[in-house]
Amino acid sequence: MAEPFSIVTGALSVAALFNNCVTSFEYIQLGRHFGGDYERCQLKLDIAKTRLSRWGQAADINNDPRFAIDEPQDKISRQVQAVLEELEQLFSTLQKASKRYAIDAVQEDLALLQIEDMRPVARNLHSRLDAIVKQRAKKTSFFKKTYWALYDAKNFEKLVTQATGFVDDLEKLFPVKDARRLVDIEIEEVKEDEPSLRALQSAAADTDSVLAEVVAQRLATSGDENYIKELRNDEQSRVRLGSEWSASALGRGIGSLAPTKNRADFVVARGSSVTHIGNSYGGRGIFDD
């Protein structure tokens, strides 16, 4: 079981509150019940953290003197402080709920998934998003933290939904005028192969609309086009439409988004025949025996 993080009380500047909220995402682990959805859920947390850090960079929160004090004078800065305090309280509330759950849970249900359990594409995205955030936020020395866990989908959705809402509120107070440019930079810092972009697109849904939109546009304008106008095949034949990546190719990000077109007007597949309309990255494909 993960231990909860403890907070050293005391007055903090608005900037320190912001940095603490960003850092708090890094101490959340997910329980085994997330199973096959683990990668998407972990990336959702990463994207929520990245979006918060993006707002902080746009607001210049670590350099603007208005945010360097614990009792800001202007109205907007006080509103920012209030939102960040609510986000901080959300982390604390869910941590307490997890602690309560752990009291009666059997040991097996307290097993945790690890970043090492992720496949190469998702693990690489997690690492690169984390690196982006570390460039934007500062480490806080006011807090002693250890890892804690979310064990069920209900509290996970509560965290993501409410945290996203709080960032929405922050963006209304300090709009991210160059959000598109910052997102473009983020995408350039991750591998722009199709599997990575599709993983980002799935995880960004309902969490980061700007990121989801930019990824969708890149996929639409740069991805492979694979097409069969008419297909006739029997039960024994095997037909694959679409590009495929070997495990090693996924790990190295092989698969350029330079547009390719693979088209067939008419395909007849019979017996033990194998047909693949698309690109194959990294050597042997799914039909290679």
What is the predicted function of each stretch?
Residues G10, A16, W148:
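Conserved, well-structured core segments
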Residues L17-F142:
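Charge-rich, amphipathic alpha-helical segments
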Residues T9-L12, E39-Q42, D46-K49, V167, ...:
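Long amphipathic alpha-helical coiled-coil
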